Amino acid sequence: MNVQITPDELYAHRPDVLLPPDPEFVEEYAQAVQFGREVASRSSIAFVFLARNSMPWLPQTLALIEQTGACFESWSAFAMENDSVDSTKDVLTEWADNRQRQASLNTYARPHLSHTMTQERTVALAEYRNACRQWVQDGDSVDLVCVLDSDSWGGWSVDGLLTSVAHIARGDWWGLASYSWCEMNTPHGPYAAGYDAWACRWTWWNQRSHDWFHHLHLPVGSRPVEMNSAFGQLAVYRADAYLRGRYSGATCEHVPYHRSIAEHPDTRGRFGFNPSSRVVSFWVPEHGRQHQPN
């Protein structure tokens, strides 16, 4: 991807800079971060992610995994890669140590359908997500699993992720998705929106119009909201719940996965959307703004 972004833009779009806690919830947010750190320090976590043509964002993602993992007593990570034609395979090869950091590099000669909702795409994504799940199942037992995307431009807030750890530890949540911010180009100029609307199902499961989701900007620091499904490029799960699920490609793969967990007879608790766990997905670069119509 040939994107011209300045260092100042990158800094301005860090989640903690762009999306700070709402003044009403500053104290509650700080308490959740602190408790999340305490829980993490005695917990284990596995990070799993898909990767295809994830440059130039992949090194930042890997660095954030290291930074987040350092908050935990122990951590491991697994990348499921396929069909990259940029330097993604090379970066993952250098990163992997076949112990704590593992990568599966694959060439399936499948088309790159990054902006479609066809089953050709969703079935493949479900296959890759299930490979991640199998890796967790086959590995050492962990307390938590973090499922993430490897190509978010601004990455995620480590403190925000820790609030999900806190809410899961002291509440009845079996999993929490993230608030994923993006900026879209429109004829009227850039527009800030919620990203990953297709993965969201609030009180329903069937696919409906999700235009409303793009306007959903809940206050950072406010408490999680129960939803049937959501993702936002990063979600944290109790490991026992994560392993009960099974991805399928009938629609966005996260939806049947979350439904399979929710309907499992051994699942306790609920799933939700955490406004404090922030991911910055993408934005309109400064050089692109120069060409916006008046």
Describe the predicted segments one by one:
Residues 140-155:
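Short beta-strand-to-loop acidic/aromatic patch adjacent to the donor-nucleotide binding site
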Residues 152-246:
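Conserved catalytic core of nucleotide-sugar-dependent glycosyltransferases
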Residues 53-61, 95-96, 152, 168-169:
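Catalytic phosphate/metal-binding cores of nucleic-acid and nucleotide-processing enzymes, i.e., regions
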